[in-house]
Amino acid sequence: MGLSFTKLFSRLFAKKEMRILMVGLDAAGKTTILYQLKLGEIVTTIPTIGFNVETVEYQYISFTVWDVGGQDKIRPLWRHYFQNTQGLIFVVDSNDRDRVVEARDELHRMLNEDELRDAVLLVFANKQDLPNAMNAAEITDKHGLHSLRQRHWYIQSTCATSGEGLYEGLDWLSNNIANKA
């Protein structure tokens, strides 16, 4: 009896740790999102060559978030970050209509990787504050998300600079990763 109570208590109140990989094309807003979550403020960013990694504490969960640069020359390196990833955040620049096909192709290429087969997918439809931004439904359609029948996925409209939508996305991510455990 005591052991089961201890397990229940630790399951409810112990800090959970989750490994999250955040990728997307260059200039989608990944680093801005990372530091908005970590610091609650906008930081001046430069294109990420390599990666940034931060621990984001949110609702009894410790998210280790790997933000990996998105320039086309370094995308082949993404695969080195796949191991043990529980959640994949794919950040889309909702205003970048010219690279929708490129973003879709990169997303599907990653989702076909064996090391990511169990990872849940959160798509951040970022830059929703811009006047020409595609909404979440349009991004869902253009990225072929409905074809992902064997994967838990969710799309969240966001604005990295204001923080709008980011924590709603983390809520979904934490609930879905915890349910798989």
Swiss-Prot record:
InterPro entries from the UniProt entry: Arf1-5-like, P-loop_NTPase, Small_GTP-bd, Small_GTPase_ARF, Small_GTPase_ARF/SAR
Homology family: Belongs to the small GTPase superfamily. Arf family.
GO-annotated cellular components: Golgi apparatus
Lineage: Eukaryota, Viridiplantae, Streptophyta, Embryophyta, Tracheophyta
Superkingdom of origin: Eukaryota
Chief place where the protein resides: Golgi
Location(s), subcellular: Golgi apparatus
Gene that specifies this protein: ARF1
Listed GO MF terms: GTP binding; GTPase activity
Keywords linked to the UniProt accession: ER-Golgi transport, Golgi apparatus, GTP-binding, Hydrolase, Lipoprotein, Myristate, Nucleotide-binding, Protein transport, Transport
Keyword Metal-binding set for record: no
PROSITE patterns: ARF
Gene3D superfamilies xref list: P-loop containing nucleotide triphosphate hydrolases (3.40.50.300)
Lipidation (N-myristoyl glycine): 2
SUPFAM superfamilies: P-loop containing nucleoside triphosphate hydrolases
Function: GTP-binding protein involved in protein trafficking; may modulate vesicle budding and uncoating within the Golgi apparatus.
GO term, biological process aspect, one: vesicle-mediated transport
Reaction it catalyzes: GTP + H2O = GDP + phosphate + H(+)
Keyword Hydrolase carried by entry: yes
Protein name in UniProt: ADP-ribosylation factor 1
Residues the record lists as binding GTP: 24-31, 67-71, 126-129
EC code(s) of this entry: 3.6.5.2
Pfam families registered for this protein in UniProt: Arf
